[in-house]
Amino acid sequence: MRILGLDLGKKTIGVAVSDPLGFTAQGITTIRRANKEKDMEELRKICDEYKVETIVIGLPKNMNGTIGPSGEIAMEMGKLVEEALNIKVEFWDERLTTVAAHKAMLEADLSRSKRKKIVDKVASTYILQGYLDRISK
């Protein structure tokens, strides 16, 4: 059982996948967004390669817990992904995942250009790992 984690951005989609047992998340790629059809094609390839059964999408929430415009866009994308790929989609609160990703990369002493290239992939790993930790309890 593999689970895919997605961090949706305007220009890129960070992608992480669980190990086969669903204990750990590993960042695997960052998809450069083009259009809905090409984005779905890229996701389909990844889902087929890893035999994904569930997709977890980071849901941006305001600090007070409400869902704003970015959250609504993520929910629309989730519906599109579920229909296009016929794979169950769940959402995970992604508040502060990008902040945590930046902090971890700074502590690892990565250059600014390197951080910029992988921040979405790292954030998707945080999203997926949070979800995996919850379902394993």
From Swiss-Prot:
SUPFAM superfamilies: Ribonuclease H-like. The keyword Nuclease applies. It comes from the Bacteria. One of its GO terms (cellular component) is cytosol. It is an enzyme of class 3 (hydrolase). It is found in: Cytoplasm. One of its GO terms (biological process) is rRNA 5'-end processing. Pfam families: RuvX. Its main location: cytoplasm. The keyword Hydrolase applies. Its EC number is 3.1.-.-. Keywords: Cytoplasm, Hydrolase, Nuclease, Ribosome biogenesis. InterPro entries: RNaseH-like_sf (IPR012337), YqgF (IPR005227), YqgF/RNaseH-like_dom (IPR006641), YqgF/RNaseH-like_dom_sf (IPR037027). GO terms for molecular function: nuclease activity. HAMAP family: Nuclease_YqgF (MF_00651). Belongs to the YqgF nuclease family. Could be a nuclease involved in processing of the 5'-end of pre-16S rRNA. This is Putative pre-16S rRNA nuclease. It comes from Clostridium botulinum (strain Eklund 17B / Type B).
